[in-house]
């Protein structure tokens, strides 16, 4: 026991005075319920007077009361954690001292009630549970009873002190617990309102999400359909690339055949050009021969003329020789005519040779140009074939990628459908 009993004094502890007739309950109408609570616990002016008479005794032992109160809190570590998180033991001891002294002031007014409401609000805010609050208040009551037993020898007055103290502590607990409940109800109402708002938001959002997923599902399905179309087009493109590649290879082979033919023509033209050069040389030699023959004919004609002259001089004896000379002259003239005709033909032949040579040169140039163009076309076909191979490979890769993409889209479509079904279920739940 914290307090020693003093049995020496047997006189009355509470003096009779008009103080107990004082109007000690000074509450306005806003605390009408508190007035009813006071009546229920039988806490009136007489009891408040007793408390006022006990105040010096409480003040004398206030340190021991407060120390015992906080020592008792060691039984629950969470209480000390709350104290250390929001204040300190020393500060709270001073606060508790003032609070206890106010309980024994002998007056209950609006300020008294408001302070208790504020205390309850603080307790709720820092997370103090009602069970720990009530347990701690029981320690206060027991400490005060020990003080009374040690100081008040008159059993009736001791009982009066215990009753008054029990009633004021009971009122304290009622006020704090009511404030607890009020704060709790307010918090619960706020949470309920938030829950309703959240419920409404979830319902609205769920509906929006449901619509969104429905649209997404349609979009994904459209994308799947389009992807399938692209896949078919890609396959068709691969087939087309293969066909173009085959035709390009065939065209390249035909071009190579034509190029070989052009090479043969070019070789033949070169040979013809060489033969034409030889023919021109032969024609030039023939012209030289014609010159010689013409000279011989002219010499023969001159000899024939000389023979005719000599025959005329010879008279009758030279007639036979004149006939021969005349025939030789005719033969010479015929030879000259023939040579002239043949020379003209040779000249015409030379002209034709020159024309043909020019044509051959032109053809040769055309053949060279054609060969060059065929070479370029051949390179172009090589590039086309190479490009078609790359295109076919890329088309095949694209088709593989499209198939994988299509598979992924189908997975997404199934996932979207599953989520959409879940959202629909959520919408139904929120509507309930």
UniProtKB/Swiss-Prot annotation:
User: Does Heme appear among the keywords?
Assistant: yes
Q: Which residues form the Methyl-accepting transducer domain?
A: 184-420
Task: Name a biological process GO annotation.
Answer: aerotaxis
Q: Does the keyword Metal-binding apply?
A: yes
> What's its job?
Heme-containing signal transducer responsible for aerotaxis, the migratory response toward or away from oxygen.
Give an example GO cellular component term for this record.
membrane
Q: How does it assemble?
A: Homotetramer.
PANTHER family, per this entry? HEME-BASED AEROTACTIC TRANSDUCER HEMAT (PTHR32089:SF118), METHYL-ACCEPTING CHEMOTAXIS PROTEIN MCPB (PTHR32089)
Q: Which InterPro entries match?
A: Globin-like_sf, Globin-sensor_dom, Globin/Proto, MCPsignal_dom, Protoglobin_sensor_dom
Which keywords has UniProt assigned to this entry? Answer: Heme, Iron, Metal-binding, Transducer
Family to which this protein belongs: Belongs to the methyl-accepting chemotaxis (MCP) protein family.
Record's protein name: Heme-based aerotactic transducer HemAT
The organism sits in which domain of life? Bacteria
What are the recorded GO MF terms, alphabetically?
heme binding; metal ion binding; oxygen binding
SUPFAM superfamilies hit by this protein: Globin-like, Methyl-accepting chemotaxis protein (MCP) signaling domain
Q: Which Pfam families match?
A: MCPsignal (PF00015), Protoglobin (PF11563)
